[in-house]
Amino acid sequence: MAKAKFERTKPHVNIGTIGHVDHGKTTTTAAITKVLADTYPELNEAFAFDSIDKAPEEKERGITINISHVEYQTEKRHYAHVDAPGHADYIKNMITGAAQMDGAILVVAATDGPMPQTREHVLLARQVGVPYILVALNKCDMVEDEEIIELVEMEVRELLAEQDYDEEAPIVHISALKALEGDEKWGKQILELMQACDDNIPDPVRETDKPFLMPIEDIFTITGRGTVVTGRVERGTLNVNDDVDIIGIKEKSTSTTVTGIEMFRKLLDSAEAGDNCGLLLRGIKREDVERGQVIVKPGAYTPHTEFEGSVYVLSKDEGGRHTPFFDNYRPQFYFRTTDVTGVVKLPEGTEMVMPGDNVDMSVTLIQPVAMDEGLRFAIREGSRTVGAGRVTKIIK
């Protein structure tokens, strides 16, 4: 029986709804699925509002996040859409990366205009690297006065510009509720919103197009053949006989050639992002490499020891710390496959960090780790996860 193959006929884009509580994020999500299911029944099924709103809990690195996933298609694209109903859920999702977003729909109620969480979500989207935001101005059926709508639009554009987002981004007037009720005029506006997503959210750069990178999980010696390292390819593609560097953890990097690639006990000519495989390395002894190092295309990545990160600290209920931590806190930072101890410097004016907080911090690691902006990590004390974060800036 052949496995059902994932059809790669259309570009796949991850998208999400962001915005202030009660401005209609979930209703907008439901309206999109309904209108697309009505318009392109052969491509889509509708998801009921309550199935989206009762978001299942997800465990991402031990942090409980309520998040719902729906998928839908336009004629041009296949979208996977995440909706995090609660504000805390949204923040946790953004920082821990339970769902990566290639673009976001910022939902703003025309009746309220931008509110504190609207601003906070846009700031977070910038910090975690969401590349594009467009706007759904919701509840437009409730505002008679055109001037009010124009004022709200101006405020939203200023907000986007503050965070270096496209000030000229489309702002589509919608009424998610009316569209859900089957109103034809407002249904058309949802289609316009999706057209704006198709036209303005850039096609994502897929992991396979980036330079090769594979974190080492395990190391074996095969008598008579040499050393094999195993792991999951994070980025790029690799062919047999390619040269690679082994970097991170140790002072010096090592160069070698991949003489064989094995997957599910079969020999392959190449490996690509997403594959779990073993690489046979020429002239490398078992003690030359260790878990936590990464195998990379020569010169494509560099190891670093100092960075700034945006971190969510687990609350006591989530299994995190029971007490705050202070400047010079020294936990382990778990990157990809290994822990490295680091020293935390808190931002000026922050005396301490409480469980349940999110904070921006600077970290100095005692060993170098191959990283770039956007890389995620967990913060651990022994085997217990106490926080999750992502690299926002490399210092050294």
UniProtKB/Swiss-Prot annotation:
At which positions is Mg(2+) bound? 26
Please name one Pfam family that this protein belongs to. Answer: GTP_EFTU_D3
- The ranges of region (G1) come to 19-26
Q: So where does GTP get bound? A: 19-26, 83-87, 138-141
The entry lists its GO molecular-function terms as: GTP binding; GTPase activity; translation elongation factor activity
Q: Catalytic activity, per the record?
A: GTP + H2O = GDP + phosphate + H(+)
Top EC category:
hydrolase
Key words of the record: Cytoplasm, Elongation factor, GTP-binding, Hydrolase, Magnesium, Metal-binding, Nucleotide-binding, Protein biosynthesis
**Is GTP-binding among this UniProt entry's keywords?**
yes
Pinpoint the tr-type G domain residues.
Answer: 10-205
For region G3, the annotated ranges are 83-86
Coiled coil (residue ranges): none
**Is Cytoplasm among this UniProt entry's keywords?**
yes
Can you name a GO cellular component term?
cytosol
Where are the residues of the annotated region G5?
Answer: 175-177
Annotated segments matching region G4:
138-141
Q: Where in the cell is it found?
A: Cytoplasm
Instruction: Write out the ranges of the annotated region (G2).
Output: 62-66
Q: What is its EC number?
A: 3.6.5.3
Quaternary structure (record): Monomer.
The entry sums up its family as follows: Belongs to the TRAFAC class translation factor GTPase superfamily. Classic translation factor GTPase family. EF-Tu/EF-1A subfamily.
Question: What does the function comment of this entry state?
Answer: GTP hydrolase that promotes the GTP-dependent binding of aminoacyl-tRNA to the A-site of ribosomes during protein biosynthesis.
Protein name in the entry = Elongation factor Tu
